[in-house]
Amino acid sequence: MKALRRMMAGLVCAALLFGRAAGEASFDFTDGMPDVPETAAPTENPAPTITLSPAFEMTVIRPAAQQHHGTILIYHTHTWEAYRQTDERYQETEKWRTKDERYNVVAVGEALTRALTALGYTVVHDTTAFEPPKLADAYARSLTMLEQRTASGEAYDLYIDLHRDAISSTSTIRRTVNIGGEDAARFMVLVGKGTTGGYREMPDFAANLHIAELLTDKLEAQCEGLSRDVKVRTGRFNQHIAPRCILIECGTNENTLEEVLCGIPYLAQAIAETLDALEAETAINNVE
């Protein structure tokens, strides 16, 4: 349990970034988390915003004026992407991947869902495993899900395909940034042009790139180095399905899950600020 205390301390390392004021919301990141042996190493300086009865709880203090409205879809085309093994080892499906949703990107998506919900958003987190039976066809299967949602009349203010990036152990890419004494994994937004593959339906690349750049700027404004530069690829990545589609890489295979979760409150805040900026731009354009 002490090892879990250390892991959860990372979750709250940025909780006060929202500012202390009248409104507050709580969300528990530990639903479904595995039990940890009592022999695990103790933590230093545990975060004061964790309540240990009966489960760890993260309390985000924020002004009532920051309550947001909007809908967000989070899903994972590469559902089994996972992180560097720690003392809390998971069963690998293959190298850097696991079916266990407590340890793969689904756990990150769940944490982001709770953080955004606490900010007032309506979030749909689709945890469908799109990788089996063959990883190469995962985008075709996630596209089917998106098409079915669109056909049923669903529409969202932001579509997020949440991934984990892959780098080599010798890569010079910086793995983490320090936030309040804790190491947090870095994020990266990816957008596709759709220029390869012979597609007839193309993404709104310029609009998606604008969103990616806004989100990157909002992350950097909170903590320099928290975001890597926007990555532009020639593929489509299903970003043609609707306006405002982005792919977010949450850390890399060289990060731990703890490091990724440490940055989630910052990512949620950056997403909120990005959507606020887009709403303001729309209002200005409507006036003009």
Predicted regions: what they are:
Residues 141-149, 157-247, 251-252:
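Catalytic cores of processing enzymes, dominated by hydrolases/peptidases
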